[in-house]
Amino acid sequence: MTTARDNSATTLELYRKTLNFNVIGRYDPKIKQLLFHTPHATVYKWEAGENKWNKLEYQGVLAIYLRDVREQAELPVPHQEASAGAEGRCGEVLSGRDIYNYALIVLNRINPENFSIAIAPNSVVNKRRLFSPEENVQQPLEPMDVEVKDELVIIKNLRKEVYGIWIHTPTDRQNIYDLLKYLLENEPKDSFA
């Protein structure tokens, strides 16, 4: 039997998902389906030269979502002022043909700049390297990797940069790891039921 409390919790969760979907849509109009979200995440970057994690200025809702990727779509060219700050702290802005079926975003509560990682299944990256070598020379991409260590979900992005995402809830941490691992190891999907 469903109680009023269960109905309220379900309604609140649906509201949160809808709100997150709409907010993400302002930053990435190609959002197609919200796959997972958690209310609190903090981003760290691994500095190999210093052999330590540096905490970045990104904290907030973390979401992983499916993107609407068309065969010949090009990534939009970012505004110069927006990309300059992001490149200094979070790596290069991707350009060229849009092969990024999924994305991870942290909707930042600290400042207006959000953190995002483009996610392409490793099979897509490998096919690009094989069938589009000229594109790979212009913008080389490497297969991504993900692991859980201590309290961080560690992600090696397409540019070999390593980020650690601290997730408040251990269950959410494991769910994010499992989802990212699935997205990287399987062929891209057009939708999730």
Curated annotation (Swiss-Prot):
Keywords: Cytoplasm, mRNA processing, Nonsense-mediated mRNA decay, RNA-binding. InterPro entries: Dcp1, PH-like_dom_sf. Signal peptide: none annotated. GO terms for cellular component: cytoplasmic side of membrane; nucleus; P-body; RNA decapping complex. Its main location: cytoplasm. It is found in: Cytoplasm, P-body. The keyword RNA-binding applies. GO terms for biological process: deadenylation-dependent decapping of nuclear-transcribed mRNA; deadenylation-independent decapping of nuclear-transcribed mRNA; mRNA processing; nuclear-transcribed mRNA catabolic process, nonsense-mediated decay. Coiled coil: none annotated. GO terms for molecular function: enzyme activator activity; mRNA binding. SUPFAM superfamilies: PH domain-like. Component of the decapping complex. Component of the decapping complex necessary for the degradation of mRNAs, both in normal mRNA turnover and in nonsense-mediated mRNA decay. Removes the 7-methyl guanine cap structure from mRNA molecules, yielding a 5'-phosphorylated mRNA fragment and 7m-GDP. Decapping is the major pathway of mRNA degradation in yeast. It occurs through deadenylation, decapping and subsequent 5' to 3' exonucleolytic decay of the transcript body. Belongs to the DCP1 family. This is mRNA-decapping enzyme subunit 1. It comes from Eremothecium gossypii (strain ATCC 10895 / CBS 109.51 / FGSC 9923 / NRRL Y-1056) (Yeast).
